[in-house]
Amino acid sequence: MSEVHEPGETFVVQPGTATSFWQPVPANGHIEVALDPSKVKMDNPLAFGTQTVPPGGYVREHSHDRHEEVIYFIKGKGRAVLDGKDVPAVLGTAIFVGKSRRHMFINDSTEDLHWVWLIVP
């Protein structure tokens, strides 16, 4: 016999309604958190949103000891530094960052650098 499962949640975030945070220098940009467990009940916790860094800004090197992260660049160009190695960050670049891996993002162009991110769990 097949197991019966209760339906999961549905939740919609319209443009301009995500939780938004200003990031001070050196990023000097903003991050939007569209989905996370504080907003909707999830069987498999995750967080999803966007980040924008203006020309000359960067996200400081950091790591997540309990989370994996996916980054997908949707506008602009810059660089990602993954465990000390530079990689181009341009439209369509997808990056997977495993737990405890150092990473940072640098906008060394003349336009905003914009990406979508997903963090699990």
Regions found by a protein language model. Name each.
Residues 75, 83, 120:
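Cofactor-binding loop segments of dinucleotide-utilizing enzymes, especially the Rossmann-like FAD-
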Residues 55, 66, 85, 101-102, ...:
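A generic "binding-loop/recognition-motif" signal
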Residues 45, 50-54, 63-80:
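Short, conserved beta-strand element in jelly-roll/cupin
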Residues 1-46, 60:
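A short, N-terminal "cap"/entry segment at the start of jelly-roll beta-barrel domains
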Residues 84-99:
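Short acidic-glycine-tyrosine-enriched beta hairpin
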Residues 60-62, 80-81, 97, 103-109:
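Short beta-strand His + acidic residue motifs that chelate non-heme Fe in jelly-roll/DSBH
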